[in-house]
Every structure is written in structure tokens, then in C-alpha cells.
């Protein structure tokens, strides 16, 4: 049962640095795998998207630096998509500064979650080890 309580006060802790934000989303990726290990229904195909994006973007970046002439288009396409999404976010916020912030925040969020998800997936599903916690010290 869901109830709306308009007078309820909800405290939200914002991350004060990009490193703390990275740790937070990394742990979310780890937590999703741990939840999926408890109940398969809590691990849906959509949860794999940041991990897939992390792998594909890493490969595209690697191949761009190996052979920039032949692999430049894919790299440019990825940067163009990032700029488009950042532009949509800035338009939504009605603040141009959001565009420049989102150019950094979006990759940190996707890569942080994706890396946590990938490492926890390998740890729990491939090596069949016990629960893994990710960042535990200096999390916040």
C-alpha cells in the first residue's frame, strides 16, 4: 500500500564530490547483483544496460586510440549522443550550465553503476563467491 503524506519531511543527502557520487552508483550496481542473487525477479534485462554501455564505450574508446582514422566515427557518434543527452538535460533544467555538468555526470553515473554491476556479476555469478559489498570505507 502506498500513501502520500504531503507534510512528511524527507532528507536527501547529496554527494559533495564526484568521487563520492561514483562510489554511490558503483555500490548500486553491486547491490543490484546481490538482490538478483536473492531473487531472480529483481534482476531484469534493463539492469544490464549500464554494464553493456560501459563495455561498448570502453571498446570504442580503446579502438579509437589504437586507430583513430578508421574508428573515429564510432567515437564521434558516442560523443555526439552524450552531447545530445546533456543538451536535453540542460533544456529540461532550463540552465545552460547543466549541459557542461551533465557531460561529466552522465558518464560517471553509467560507468560507476556499470563497473559495479560487472565486477559483482563476475564475483557472484561466474566465480560463485559470497556476497560482495563494493566500497565500504569512506562511502559517504
Locate predicted features.
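Membrane-interface anchor segments at the N-terminal boundary of transmembrane helices
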Residues: 41-52
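Histidine-centered active-site/metal-ligand motif
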Residues: 12, 47, 110
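Low-complexity, flexible helical/coil segments
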Residues: 38-43, 63, 137-140
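Catalytic donor/gating beta->alpha subdomain of glycosyltransferases that bind UDP-sugars
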Residues: 1-43
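Short linear functional motifs in flexible/disordered or boundary regions
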Residues: 22, 37, 44, 119, ...
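Short linear elements at protein peripheries
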Residues: 124-140
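Membrane-embedded multi-pass helical conduit in multi-pass membrane proteins
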Residues: 50-127
Amino acid at each position: 500500500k502506498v500513501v502520500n503524506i504531503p507534510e512528511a519531511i524527507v532528507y536527501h543527502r547529496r554527494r559533495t564530490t564526484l568521487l563520492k557520487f561514483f562510489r554511490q552508483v558503483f555500490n548500486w550496481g553491486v547491490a543490484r547483483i546481490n538482490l538478483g542473487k536473492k531473487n531472480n525477479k529483481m534482476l531484469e534485462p534493463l539492469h544490464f544496460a549500464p554494464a553493456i554501455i560501459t563495455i561498448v564505450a570502453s571498446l570504442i574508446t580503446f579502438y579509437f586510440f589504437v586507430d583513430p582514422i578508421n574508428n573515429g566515427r564510432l567515437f564521434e557518434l558516442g560523443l555526439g549522443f552524450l552531447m545530445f543527452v546533456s543538451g536535453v538535460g540542460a533544456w529540461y533544467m532550463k540552465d545552460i550550465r547543466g549541459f557542461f555538468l551533465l557531460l561529466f555526470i552522465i558518464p560517471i553515473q553509467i560507468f560507476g553503476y556499470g563497473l559495479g554491476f560487472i565486477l559483482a556479476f563476475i564475483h557472484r555469478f561466474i566465480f560463485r563467491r559470497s556476497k560482495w559489498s563494493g566500497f565500504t570505507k569512506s562511502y559517504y
